[in-house]
């Protein structure tokens, strides 16, 4: 190696990483991109090799493979002139295709706020979920930024769930996911015993260049109809959620015993005599956190013990790869798909009562005013003194004599825990954290697996105590990593965008409300608004709209703070059994603890690891994706179950609130049931209706009739579309009568039409007038 070559390699900021992976390293992808960017023009392969002083045959071959891989991943574009160019220099985008049931689609591009529109004819070249390279194609007639597909970089959708049909001797599968806009052709030799109408899984075959007709092989027959549990099986496959542990993982976990070995307990702080207890819901099966609190001076000392999952799940082991790919456990209404095998999630890693367990401990000191004044982390062994439930603890705090007698030794500690909670709650309000009181629901199933009733979930003080204790441990963990400049996955929550802020303020103005803070409202401003409206009958609606105005919390290597919690740093530490980000944080903390004791290695004997920032950056994107994937899948199942429930109520009348207003109708959320349905614009009164997006309302052009977000209404259930997971309603009355025709109403309507975009006049032509609507009116949905 020449001196010039050595010096150039040393300029690569990722050289050490490459050296750890390869004995004879080549420049990193990042450095190759920098070289091409600095050249200010596309480069052929020889020019790149010369610029990087690469002459060794093995390294030339390695570079050829790396450049091809970078091309496949969309980092580089190989032009017709056989040169490598940067996509952004060619004005190209990399992104994920999101299909729409109407046949068009959108391109989600990392780092871009708005999605790009993919017209129907371009969607014929791709499929929902594809990772593609696309080129801007101007604006469509509605002013949306349109793209043209250049190349499919990765076909991510390998398997599709749907119903199998036969027609004129041809077999095909109609996808259950409406975002997949085309049927899948199944040749006779690939039906594998599937019969007409069965729910099947079809595996897509290699696509042709034109991709005119997707072809597949039936690999699994799920059943003849929607049997019990079928909705979960479909959602798992629709969202590509891993739900069966590979044989290699099953083999790997066989080495674990039911009890913690004495060898594993060595060198740990012994907390077995400390009366730590778990407090969870009645139906909880895995217990990954335990708490104990005692008075300390004028304040308190709090121990939060978390299952030491990282001791068993070692980095890059077969088990770790599977946990990483899953990202998190998925909680369906009637089934759990765990991140870890049961021997760990319900066994060795679960802090079950009266058994020794390994744990990571965050021991904290809190002032009388609820401020975290000191903390320390360490590895320990514990023995849970009791498995308590939220209901039991709440009753004990309320004075239940029978329970207080049964758990007499624990009651004093629980009372201190409650006093601590009150101080933490006061400190939370003092810093201005947004305190949402969202209504969650629980499905009660009958023996057939169908919903018998839907109940709201009540969060008592015991549940809130644990939430505050966990949040404090998360704060301490994030602070520990930030203080030591150790790469970590932070739970970040960005400030609201200007667009969403403006929209929310317009909504508030309709209710005579304001959000203080000018262009940059603080968390305290939002909290003050919620406090102001909490006694109003429409407070749930206002809170929902406030939630929509905020950004989504995600995992990220860059710590920008958590807006909603009003915190400078926050991370997830307390649930490593069910969340991979927590597992990575445990590894980082263990590494720092070992480093403080003089250790020099990146790994520790108990499962610690020093991640690089780049590794964390990739993990942040991945874990945020798996979290969204789980949310989408559970929402899909809940929607299906709600529709199934509503099938027994077609023709029934219910009260509800308008929860969303669109150009094609109103969505109404039913009181008590919390089920949403659509009142299509074609079913409204005999008038032309215009959508006022700014003020979230539909306005009758002639009558002045208005339907507004938050209006209380009475509806009739008209139809249930189980295949689309949608319910149709019709309006039969409104508790707050909409403003009807009259001089004032008409003038207001005219004023609104003048304020609407000019293209509104074009829409008016297609607005639906009841007397002109036949039974064949298509029900346009978004």
Swiss-Prot record:
The gene is rnr. Residues 651-732 form the S1 motif domain. This is Ribonuclease R. CDD domains: S1_RNase_R. It comes from the Bacteria. Residues 268-594 form the RNB domain. It is found in: Cytoplasm. Residues 744-757 have a biased composition (Basic and acidic residues). 3'-5' exoribonuclease that releases 5'-nucleoside monophosphates and is involved in maturation of structured RNAs.
